[in-house]
């Protein structure tokens, strides 16, 4: 129906559009010729060398997503809050894991990289009285799809981490699962089409109104709500995964097989 809003706020029907052909909605498929488990020979690349040179730790959480505008906990991918929780989870910890952020702000420029580092450092500065903190590394710049697959398959990358407020689908999360990479993320929104609580690690939280400063018409409008991850549960799930990653890796392999069959481009064709 076509509706028109009146001065008093009421909506009046002004017409209608009738469809004379059926509509089918396809799911978003993953290119499983690219996003799949890779062997050691397939991992040989400049990217692998660069990451291994940059990141010395052998246990690394990976995040892939754009660092959008907003204050602490307001960017849609929730990266600033995620960084703070990671630091808190493993502060003063012997042999801590690392966090690798594949992120950027508006673009891939030198200025953007500096601003991204500044926003990460702002969270680190909250722990000025802590003796030791885990390392956070920034991977800033454009990667090819083949390089992204290599990144998900690197042995030291143990899990994909996201504290997102909401996703239309969550493509990087889906692609990571197809590479058999365990996923730790919020248990709400589009990513639940291909994740579950048994074969992935889901973070608890609650729906809250989108901050007024983040309203983005016509994408995010009032009175929209999005998912806010519980900070305590983020910390618990990070520590839980660190202790149980071998068992959770086994579950991720099961999910990877399911998603490569169910969410591939070939499966889209059958729809």
Regions found by a protein language model. Give the residues of each.
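Conserved catalytic-core segment of nucleotide-activated headgroup transferases in glycan assembly
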Residues: 30-147
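Aromatic "clamp/platform" in nucleotide-sugar-dependent glycosyltransferases that forms part
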Residues: 165
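Short alpha-helical segment that forms part of, or immediately flanks, the ligand-binding pocket
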Residues: 149, 174-178, 182, 189-193
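Donor nucleotide-sugar binding/catalytic pocket of nucleotide-sugar-dependent glycosyltransferases
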Residues: 1-46
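A short alpha->beta transition loop at the rim of the catalytic pocket in nucleotide-sugar-dependent
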Residues: 156-158, 180, 187
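C-terminal "capping" alpha-helix adjacent to the active site of nucleotide-linked donor transferases
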Residues: 206-247
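A charged, aromatic-enriched C-terminal amphipathic alpha-helix characteristic of glycosyltransferases
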Residues: 225-229, 233, 243-271
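Short hydrophobic beta-strand element within catalytic cores of glycosyltransferases
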Residues: 182-185, 199-202
């Amino acid at each position: 129906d076509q509706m028109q809003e009146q001065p008093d706020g009421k909506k009046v029907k002004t017409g209608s559009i009738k469809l004379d052909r059926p509509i089918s909605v396809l799911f978003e498929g993953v290119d499983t010729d690219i996003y799949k488990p890779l062997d050691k020979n397939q991992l040989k690349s400049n990217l692998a060398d660069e990451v291994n040179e940059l990141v010395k730790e052998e246990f690394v959480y990976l995040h892939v997503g754009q660092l959008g505008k907003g204050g602490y906990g307001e960017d849609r991918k929730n990266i600033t809050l995620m960084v703070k929780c990671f630091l808190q989870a493993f502060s003063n910890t012997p042999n801590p894991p690392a966090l690798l952020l594949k992120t950027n702000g508006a673009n891939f420029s030198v200025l953007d990289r500096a601003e991204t580092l500044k926003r990460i450092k702002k969270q680190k500065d909250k722990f000025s009285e802590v003796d030791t903190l885990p390392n956070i590394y920034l991977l800033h710049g454009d990667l090819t799809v083949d390089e992204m697959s290599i990144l998900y398959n690197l042995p030291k990358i143990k899990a994909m981490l996201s504290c997102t407020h909401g996703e239309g689908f969550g493509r990087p999360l889906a692609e990571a699962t197809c590479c058999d990479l365990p996923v730790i993320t919020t248990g709400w929104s589009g990513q639940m089409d291909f994740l579950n609580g048994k074969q992935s690690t889901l973070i608890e939280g609650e729906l809250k109104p989108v901050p007024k400063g983040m309203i983005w018409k016509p994408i995010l409008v009032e009175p929209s709500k999005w998912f806010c991850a519980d900070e305590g549960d983020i910390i618990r799930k990070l520590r839980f995964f660190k202790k149980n990653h071998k068992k959770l890796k086994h579950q991720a392999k099961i999910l990877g097989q399911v998603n490569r069959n169910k969410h591939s481009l070939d499966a889209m064709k059958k729809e």
